[in-house]
């Protein structure tokens, strides 16, 4: 029972960074912005969040600075794709190559190339009195980092925003038919830039979570493909906040399972266990990838003169 409880607890904690990055992509794609540079943005967030927390001792300031760094970096993508109508995929891939290398370079410039691993104090858990004593579910849901609670609230807000509000419907119209949205008076370019702001900030917070709330250290490759898994989670969740939550919990479970199997003593090379989350991603995309269609204007340049 303890093994199962610890597995479920790790599932929730490991699902959070993927969930944050997935929500970032959801806000982007709902406005027609397909940003595949999530891995790079999360890497920037992880490094800046760690450095800020290391210098100031504040986890919250680390998360905030990580969000700002990702936001600023993503403005390059926004200007290129929204204003210059450049290809989304090319700039997203460039971001995935450039940002992790930049993060690694900055880390080595600041700390040097020594072998000692720098550490910070991660964000403490906040228990909810009464609820935390519920068997199994108590520690799982009500004795977590504040970022876990905030992320679940963000899922709820996102579901209500896109499903129940007029602003959310206008936002989605930009991703479905921007020309028609423009004729209704919706500021298409403004919404697309807003989507890039949200995407840059949230995906970087997902990376900063890994260093300030989960691992307490920064290492090259700490994001470990979660940006690409988040892309799969958006498709798996059918561009719906609730579906994305379930998809991220599934991927979080796969990640937690591979960690537990590595220390289980099973006489199998650990690399096979490390493959589990990525194999699960490939399988999921193979099963449902061709059956799902996102917003109709995803990745397509918007030009005012086409109205």
What are these regions (language model features)?
Residues 140-218, 241, 246:
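Helix-loop-helix "hairpin" substructures at the membrane interface of multi-pass membrane proteins
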Residues 100-164, 265-273, 299-307:
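Transmembrane helix-bundle core of multi-pass membrane transporters
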Residues 6-55, 63, 68, 72-89, ...:
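Single transmembrane alpha-helix segments in multi-pass membrane proteins
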Residues 176-190, 261-307:
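Cytosolic-side transmembrane-helix boundaries in multi-pass membrane proteins
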Residues 21-22, 46-50, 100-101, 148-160, ...:
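Hydrophobic core segments of alpha-helical transmembrane domains in multi-pass membrane transport
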Residues 214-278:
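Transmembrane alpha-helical segments in multi-pass inner-membrane proteins
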Residues 30-34, 73-130, 224-225, 229-242:
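Short loop segments and helix-boundary regions at transmembrane helix junctions
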Residues 8-11, 40, 60-68, 90, ...:
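Hydrophobic alpha-helical transmembrane segments
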